[in-house]
Regions:
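N-terminal entrance/gating region of PLP-dependent enzymes' catalytic architecture
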Residues: 1-108, 392-393, 430
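PLP-dependent enzyme catalytic core of the Aspartate aminotransferase-like
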Residues: 223, 404-466
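Conserved PLP-enzyme active-site core in the AAT-like
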Residues: 7, 115-294
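Conserved PLP-binding active-site segment of the aspartate aminotransferase-like
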Residues: 199, 366-378, 392-427
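Short Gly/Ser/Thr- and Asp/Glu-enriched loop/turn motifs at secondary-structure junctions
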Residues: 106-108, 144, 360-367, 405-407
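Active-site C-terminal subdomain of aminotransferase-like
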Residues: 246-249, 253-366, 371-375, 455-458, ...
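Short amphipathic alpha-helices in soluble, non-transmembrane regions
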Residues: 381-389, 426-431
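Buried hydrophobic packing segments
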Residues: 90, 94-97, 120-129, 159, ...
Length: 466
C-alpha cells in the first residue's frame, strides 16, 4: 500500500505500510477511524439504494426513526423479561395489524414479529402442515400420505424453500396467456386429502398484481361442499397487506374470509420500516397448534416463542411501532397513494413511448412490469436494464416462470422515497437511451451469446490442435 504523506481526512490510513488481509484476521488492531474508512470506501462501490427500483425494501425513514433504532440496537427481541416494554410494543403491533386485517378478536390476536416475510411464511406453512398432520394422525406419516401445498407458480422463492425444507410437495398453478398468477378453479382442482393449504399472493413479485383471494376461497368452499375437503388459505401479503387496507378498502382478502387462516406481511416493505422485520398473524388460537409454541425459562421468565431463530434485534419492531404511531391510517393511506400515483403515472409515460408493452400499470401494488413492443427487434429488456444501470438505475430484467418462459420483462417498484421528481429523471433517462437502442441491429444479449459460442468453438479447436 502506498502511503500519501498528507495525513488526515485525505489519507486516513497514514502509518500503514501494507494493506490489511481480506480473507483472514489481521495480526493486530488498527485505529477505528482507519477501519471505518477502509470499509466505507469499499461500500461506495455498492449501488445507490434510493435508485434501486428492483427492491421492495424500505430505503428511507425519518431521522427520528433512525434515532430510536440506534437507541434499541443492543436489545435482543427474545429477552422479553429483560425488555418488557419492547415486548409490549411488539404485542401492540400484532393487535394493530389484527384490527387492520379484520381479525375476529384483534385484542386477543395470535401473532408475532419475524425477520421478514420469508420467516413469516415458513411459520405459517408449518402451522398449516401441523394442523393437517393432527387431522390425519391415523395415516401420517406414511408413504401414502405425503402433504402438499397448492399455490401459483409466481410465488416468492420462500415457498419453494418451505416445501423443500419440510418435505411438502409443491403443487403450482402455471401461468397461461395473459394470466400471470393463480387461477382459483385450477388451484381447487389440485387439492386432495393431502393438501395442507392453499396460498394466495396479495401482490405478485413478478408484476405487482393481486391474486383473487376471495375467488380462491369461494372455489375451495365449493370443493368442500362437493368432497368434504376443508383446505385453509394463507395470504402472503408481503407487500399488499400494507397497501390494500388503505387504498382498496372494498377488496375482501383478509380475515373477513372465514377460510383465511393466516396472513403475513413485511414491515420492511410497505410497512415503511428499514430491514428486517416481518409479521405473521393467525385468525385465532386454534389456527396455531399449541405444540409449535415453545416455552423457555432461562432468560428470567416463562417465555413463549414461535420462530425459526432465537436472538434478533428489537430495533426494527420499535421502528414499526413508531411508524404506526407516527402515521396512523390516514398517514399510511397518503404515503401508499403517493407511491401508487407515481407508479401509474410513470407506467403511462413508458407505455406512451411506443417501444414497450405494459403488462401491469401499478394500480394494485405500486409496481408494474413491461416488455418490449412486438415490433421491437433491435433491443430487448436486458439491453434496457444494462443501459439504465449505466445511469445508476437498478431495474431487474427477467423471464417469467412456466408456462411463460418466453416472456422477458422489466419491473419497476415504486415505494416511499421514489418521488415524482425521481420518476421524471428515470423517464428522461429511459427516453434518452432509446435512439441508441433503436439503432442496434440486434439485441446485445444475442450478440454476447454468439460471441461466447464463437470463443468456445475457437477454444475447442485450439485444444484439438494440441
Amino acid at each position: 500500500m502506498s502511503v500519501n504523506p498528507f495525513l488526515g481526512p485525505a489519507n486516513p490510513v497514514g502509518g500503514m505500510t501494507e494493506a490489511p488481509p481480506r480473507h483472514r484476521l489481521p495480526d493486530g488492531p488498527m485505529a477505528p477511524s482507519t477501519a471505518y474508512q477502509l470499509v466505507h470506501d469499499e461500500l461506495m462501490l455498492d449501488g445507490n439504494a434510493r435508485l434501486n427500483l428492483a427492491t421492495f425494501v424500505t430505503t428511507w425513514m425519518e431521522p427520528e426513526a433512525g434515532l430510536l433504532m440506534a437507541e434499541c440496537r443492543d436489545k435482543n427481541m427474545i429477552d422479553k423479561d429483560e425488555y418488557p416494554r419492547t415486548a409490549e410494543l411488539e404485542r401492540r403491533c400484532v393487535a394493530m395489524l389484527a384490527d387492520l386485517w379484520n381479525a375476529p378478536d384483534p385484542a386477543g390476536a395470535v401473532g408475532c414479529s419475524t425477520t421478514g416475510s420469508s420467516e413469516a411464511c415458513m411459520l405459517a406453512g408449518l402451522a398449516l402442515k401441523r394442523r393437517w398432520a393432527l387431522r390425519n394422525a391415523g395415516r401420517y406419516p406414511s408413504r401414502e400420505a405425503r402433504p402438499n401445498l397448492v399455490m401459483g407458480v409466481n410465488v416468492q422463492v420462500c415457498w419453494d424453500k418451505f416445501c423443500t425444507f419440510w418435505e411438502v410437495e409443491p403443487r403450482q398453478v402455471p401461468m397461461e396467456g395473459d394470466r400471470f398468477h393463480l387461477d382459483p378453479a385450477a388451484a381447487a382442482e389440485l387439492c386432495d386429502e393431502n393438501t395442507i393449504g392453499a396460498v394466495g399472493i396479495l401482490g405478485s413479485t413478478f408484476d405487482g398484481s393481486y391474486e383473487p383471494v376471495a375467488e380462491l376461497c369461494a372455489a375451495l368452499d365449493d370443493l368442500q361442499e362437493r368432497t368434504g375437503l376443508d383446505v385453509p388459505v394463507h395470504v402472503d401479503g408481503a407487500s399488499g397487506a400494507m397497501i390494500a387496507p388503505f387504498l382498496d378498502e372494498d377488496l375482501v382478502w383478509d380475515f373477513r374470509l372465514e377460510r383465511v387462516a393466516s396472513v403475513n406481511t413485511s414491515g420492511h416493505k410497505y410497512g415503511l420500516v428499514y430491514p428486517g422485520v416481518g409479521w405473521v398473524l393467525w385468525r385465532d388460537a386454534a389456527a396455531l397448534p399449541e405444540e409449535l409454541v415453545f416455552r423457555v425459562n432461562y432468560l428470567g421468565g416463562e417465555l413463549p416463542t414461535f420462530a425459526l431463530n432465537f436472538s434478533r434485534p428489537g430495533a426494527q419492531v420499535v421502528a414499526q411501532y413508531y411508524s404506526f404511531l407516527r402515521l396512523g391510517r390516514d398517514g399510511y393511506r397518503a404515503v401508499q397513494q403517493a407511491a401508487r400515483d407515481v407508479a401509474t403515472g410513470l407506467s403511462a409515460r413508458i407505455g406512451a413511448l411506443g417501444d414497450f408493452r405494459l403488462l401491469t400499470r401499478g394500480d394494485e401494488l405500486p409496481v408494474f412490469a413491461f416488455t418490449t413492443a412486438p415490433d421491437v427487434t433491435a433491443f430487448d429488456v436486458f439491453d434496457v436494464a444494462r443501459r439504465l444501470r449505466e445511469n445508476g438505475w437498478l431495474v431487474p430484467a427477467y423471464t417469467f416462470p412456466a408456462n411463460r418462459q418466453d416472456l422477458a420483462v422489466l419491473r419497476v417498484v415504486c415505494r416511499n422515497g421514489f418521488s415524482e421528481d425521481l420518476a421524471d429523471l428515470f423517464a428522461e433517462d429511459l427516453t434518452r437511451l432509446l435512439p441508441e437502442l433503436r439503432s442496434q441491429s440486434h439485441p446485445l444479449t444475442l450478440l454476447t451469446w454468439d460471441a461466447l459460442r464463437t470463443a468456445r468453438r475457437a477454444a475447442r479447436a485450439l485444444s484439438g490442435r494440441r
